[in-house]
Design a protein with these regions (language model features):
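HIT superfamily nucleotide-processing domains
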Residues: 1-168
Length: 168
């Protein structure tokens, strides 16, 4: 394996995310705004499932195809602030998402977890959410691109179509 430390990372699809990072995140919380727009806009907003207290959404700036996020409808910034029922629903939706990802993409593994707080890597730090990132051998680390360009074999729209039906 060749040494890749201090190499350039090429992930052009994340540029829009990086540019938006300097904006005031509390200006508009996507995890509040998107569900509030109603289920008729779920395809446009990439919401693949709505539960009682949580929903599942595709990451608009994915690390890999099928990168899901599970978020509560309640606007809270930390896991301890959530009621036990909501935390349990988040875990059940993550498990369900992994089952659907398994059937759809057959990943070799997953990264599942929370980035709570900006210093921990949270892009939307004021609304707790869980990442479910399918992984394949050869994608190197949490970022699918390290030194060489990785081709995303599917558009977000194709990922939505492939995954949304599994939650029904």
């Amino acid at each position: 394996m060749r040494h890749v430390a201090n190499q350039r990372i090429w992930a052009p699809w994340r540029l829009a995310y990086v540019k938006d990072a300097s904006k005031d995140i509390e200006e508009e919380c996507i995890f509040c705004a998107f569900p509030a727009q109603g289920s008729e806009r779920d395809v446009e907003n990439l919401i693949v499932h709505r539960g009682e207290g949580c929903f599942v959404i595709l990451n608009k700036f994915p690390y890999t195809n099928g990168h899901l996020m599970v978020a509560p409808f309640a606007h809270v910034s930390s896991l301890p602030q959530l009621p036990a029922e909501t935390t349990a629903e988040m875990m059940e939706l993550a498990k369900r998402g992994m089952t659907i990802l398994e059937r759809t993409y057959s990943p070799h593994g997953y990264n599942v977890g929370f980035n709570q707080g900006r210093v921990a890597g949270a892009g939307v730090e004021h609304h707790i959410h869980m990442h479910v990132v399918p992984r394949w051998g050869g994608d190197t680390n949490f970022m699918p691109v390290l030194a060489d360009t990785r081709v995303m074999p599917q558009t977000l729209e194709q990922s939505y179509e492939a995954l949304a039906g599994g939650f029904e």
